[in-house]
């Protein structure tokens, strides 16, 4: 299992992430078994690319400086053939986010694209609402994820009540998880960083992303059980979730289904 190897090798994951979630992402990676590195200083991108195993780019608090930093980082990680995960946070909400996401994808250095239905849909020309597919659009999540993977030659990861992962040839779904993931800030941001940590091991990328999604959902479900047992809520879920990520997690293959 990929998680066991991750905890043995502790890959170094460089994060260019948003300032709202940086601490949570770093703690989540540590809990999972990876080593976080948080930096958006343009002048050190070349040096950090040499020592890191993977890069996670999150555009949650986008600005001119972080855009330039992301471009510089991609250039150096691409030259070293190291995996890069892009989390196009809110790219369906503004022209700046959408155009920046497209520009980063067109660099052809992105290994995995991770987002929700609205974000991935907007990047392949399909209108979706943040709470699900637009009622006027008959396109399924399977079609969206497949198009994203094929259009950008990436492993596409769509998270939600059901997660979907595709390499453009296959589409797999992963069920489970917890509704609390949508009630805390940073669950998706940490998920993208965790994707980078798994890809940093240089195993089969499709299988690695499927395993990560399943393990993430299992940890969330475990945390939810603790919350309910202790009459907790959002705040306690956050801490129980970090605990669950740090404990042994047995991969439940029953959560995984091949869709296409």
UniProtKB/Swiss-Prot annotation:
GO terms for molecular function: ATP binding; hydroxyethylthiazole kinase activity; magnesium ion binding. This is Hydroxyethylthiazole kinase. Keywords: ATP-binding, Kinase, Magnesium, Metal-binding, Nucleotide-binding, Thiamine biosynthesis, Transferase. One of its GO terms (biological process) is thiamine biosynthetic process. The keyword Ribosomal protein does not apply. It comes from Helicobacter pylori (strain G27). It catalyses: 5-(2-hydroxyethyl)-4-methylthiazole + ATP = 4-methyl-5-(2-phosphooxyethyl)-thiazole + ADP + H(+). The gene is thiM. Pathway: Cofactor biosynthesis; thiamine diphosphate biosynthesis; 4-methyl-5-(2-phosphoethyl)-thiazole from 5-(2-hydroxyethyl)-4-methylthiazole: step 1/1. Its cofactor is Mg(2+). The keyword Transit peptide does not apply. SUPFAM superfamilies: Ribokinase-like. Belongs to the Thz kinase family. It comes from the Bacteria. Its EC number is 2.7.1.50. Gene3D superfamilies: 3.40.1190.20. Catalyzes the phosphorylation of the hydroxyl group of 4-methyl-5-beta-hydroxyethylthiazole (THZ). Substrate binds at residues 38, 186. Pfam families: HK (PF02110). ATP binds at residues 114, 159.
């Amino acid at each position: 299992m990929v998680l066991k190897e991750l905890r043995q090798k502790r890959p170094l994951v460089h994060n260019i992430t948003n300032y709202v979630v940086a601490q949570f992402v770093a703690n989540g990676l540590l809990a999972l078994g990876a080593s976080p590195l948080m930096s958006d200083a343009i002048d050190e991108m070349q040096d950090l690319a040499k020592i890191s195993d993977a890069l996670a780019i999150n555009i949650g608090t986008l600005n001119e400086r972080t855009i330039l930093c992301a471009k510089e980082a991609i250039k150096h990680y691409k030259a070293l053939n190291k995996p890069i995960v892009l989390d196009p946070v809110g790219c369906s909400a503004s022209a700046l986010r959408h155009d920046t996401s497209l520009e980063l994808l067109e660099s052809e250095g992105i290994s995995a694209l991770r987002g929700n239905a609205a974000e991935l849909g907007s990047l392949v020309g399909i209108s979706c609402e943040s709470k699900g597919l637009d009622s006027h659009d008959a396109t399924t999540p399977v079609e969206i994820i497949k198009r994203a993977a094929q259009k950008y030659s990436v492993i596409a990861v769509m998270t939600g009540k059901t997660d979907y992962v595709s390499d453009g040839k296959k589409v797999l779904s992963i069920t489970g998880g917890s509704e609390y993931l949508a009630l805390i800030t940073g669950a998706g941001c940490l998920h993208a960083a965790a994707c980078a940590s798994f890809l940093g091991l240089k195993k089969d990328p499709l299988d690695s992303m499927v395993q990560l999604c399943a393990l993430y959902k299992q940890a969330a479900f475990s945390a939810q059980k603790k919350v309910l047992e202790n009459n907790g809520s959002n705040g306690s879920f956050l801490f129980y979730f970090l605990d669950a990520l740090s404990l042994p997690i047995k991969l439940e293959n029953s959560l995984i289904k091949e869709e296409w």
